[in-house]
């Protein structure tokens, strides 16, 4: 309980300074010149050409083929509402690069491969500036935890660059995301969308959050609340990617038993914090924690490994794939 109270107090303190940050956003970005339509069109053409050229990795595999003459259009996705207009998210990608924040990406030179993918997905405040050779430069979707909003605002010039057309999905406890005037995070997101009207900001609804909890219970047999678990942004991002993408290439995610090897290489938890905590130390401390609330990183990776046995998920940097099992996983994607 004390840990939860401290978590709540920390969030409240962050929210008290958010208005000041938003004013800075208004002054620095409110008058920012938009990229001319011609440049936007050229950028879109370049991205389409990159997707068409393919790469050394397998191309996207789609379960259905679009009939000639029938216009393709993404269907609305339940549970993701626009902050400004409350309209559902419409997005679909043939192939996606889900770029983790792991230190395994340092010196990987995977950037060009990532940028050739149709849609590039990133998490929280993971930067591209200065790391493009390893993690790429494009961002199609960024999934952001409520606790990372302050860091997003501090790096707004890079992370809130509306010229890329990036979609932002914010998640958080339902009490922070209420739309009745009492949801502090939602209120600030709504203000941000007014300051930056071209920002494609979406939030996960309360009902969808409950579905994410239920999915965790179905896949692990553990109740999230009873087990004192906070779902990680990686959990939300992987599940969202399964809804959006026909194929998912995951960069920087280790297999669930990686940290058991006493000779595993030591890498930073975040590639952009080279002197930060060790990745396996972070994973193990959260997995074993019982008092307070923790992320169950290794448990989540076991689920992802299991999904990859059936669904079109592939892991790179490090490269690995799950061993086959005699019993097949159900062929329906774990979404609601």
UniProtKB/Swiss-Prot annotation:
Q: Which domain of life is it from?
A: Eukaryota
This enzyme catalyses: a ganglioside GM1b (d18:1(4E)) + CMP-N-acetyl-beta-neuraminate = a ganglioside GD1alpha (d18:1(4E)) + CMP + H(+); N-acetyl-alpha-neuraminosyl-(2->3)-beta-D-galactosyl-(1->3)-N-acetyl-beta-D-glucosaminyl-(1->3)-beta-D-galactosyl-(1->4)-beta-D-glucosyl-(1<->1')-N-acyl-sphing-4-enine + CMP-N-acetyl-beta-neuraminate = N-acetyl-alpha-neuraminosyl-(2->3)-beta-D-galactosyl-(1->3)-[N-acetyl-alpha-neuraminosyl-(2->6)]-N-acetyl-beta-D-glucosaminyl-(1->3)-beta-D-galactosyl-(1->4)-beta-D-glucosyl-(1<->1')-N-acyl-sphing-4-enine + CMP + H(+)
Tell me the Gene Ontology biological-process terms attached to this UniProt entry. ganglioside biosynthetic process; glycosphingolipid biosynthetic process; oligosaccharide biosynthetic process; oligosaccharide metabolic process; protein glycosylation
Its UniProt pathway annotation is: Glycolipid biosynthesis
The name on file for this protein is: Alpha-N-acetylgalactosaminide alpha-2,6-sialyltransferase 5
Instruction: State the disulfide connectivity.
Output: 96-245
Q: Which UniProt keywords apply?
A: Disulfide bond, Glycoprotein, Glycosyltransferase, Golgi apparatus, Lipid metabolism, Membrane, Sialic acid, Signal-anchor, Transferase, Transmembrane, Transmembrane helix
Alphabetical list of InterPro entries matching this protein: Glyco_trans_29, GT29-like_sf, Sialyl_trans
Please list the residue ranges that the record marks as compositionally biased, kind Low complexity: 38-49
Broad enzyme group: transferase
Query: Which EC number applies?
Result: 2.4.99.-
Topology Cytoplasmic: residue spans: 1-8
Region described as Disordered: spans on this chain: 32-81
Does the record carry Disulfide bond as a key word? yes
Q: Name one GO cellular component term.
A: Golgi membrane
Glycosylation sites noted in the Swiss-Prot or TrEMBL record: 137, 161
Which Gene Ontology MF annotations are present?
A: alpha-N-acetylgalactosaminide alpha-2,6-sialyltransferase activity; sialyltransferase activity
For membrane topology, the record states: Single-pass type II membrane protein
């Amino acid at each position: 309980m004390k840990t939860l109270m401290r978590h709540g107090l920390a969030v409240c303190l962050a929210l008290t300074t958010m208005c000041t940050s938003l004013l800075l956003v208004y002054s620095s970005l409110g008058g920012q010149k938009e990229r001319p339509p011609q440049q936007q069109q050229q950028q879109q053409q370049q991205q389409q050409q990159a997707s068409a050229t393919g790469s050394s990795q397998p191309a996207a595999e789609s379960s259905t083929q679009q009939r000639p003459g029938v216009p393709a259009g993404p269907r609305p996705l339940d549970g993701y509402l626009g902050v400004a207009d409350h309209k559902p998210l419409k997005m679909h990608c043939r192939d996606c690069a889900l770029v983790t924040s792991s230190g395994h990406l340092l010196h990987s030179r995977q950037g060009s491969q990532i940028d050739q993918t149709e849609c590039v997905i990133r998490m929280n405040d993971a930067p591209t500036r200065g790391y493009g050779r390893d993690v790429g430069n494009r961002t199609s979707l960024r999934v952001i935890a409520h606790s990372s909003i302050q860091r997003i605002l501090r790096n707004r010039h890079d992370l809130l660059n509306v010229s890329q057309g990036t979609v932002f999905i914010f998640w958080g406890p339902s009490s922070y995301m209420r739309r009745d005037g009492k949801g502090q995070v939602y209120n600030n997101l709504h203000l941000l969308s007014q300051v930056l009207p071209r920002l494609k900001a979406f939030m996960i609804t309360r009902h969808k959050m409950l579905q994410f909890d239920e999915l965790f219970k179905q896949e692990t047999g553990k109740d999230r609340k009873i087990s004192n678990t906070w779902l990680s942004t990686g959990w939300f991002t992987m599940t969202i990617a399964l809804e959006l993408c026909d194929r998912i290439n995951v960069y920087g995610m280790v297999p669930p038993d990686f940290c058991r090897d006493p000779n595993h290489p030591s890498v930073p938890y975040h590639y952009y914090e080279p002197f930060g905590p060790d990745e396996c130390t972070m994973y193990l401390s959260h997995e074993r924690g019982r008092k307070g609330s923790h992320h169950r990183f290794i448990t989540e990776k076991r689920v992802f490994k299991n999904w990859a046995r059936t669904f079109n998920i592939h892991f790179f940097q490090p490269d690995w794939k799950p061993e086959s099992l005699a019993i097949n996983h159900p062929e329906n994607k774990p979404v609601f």
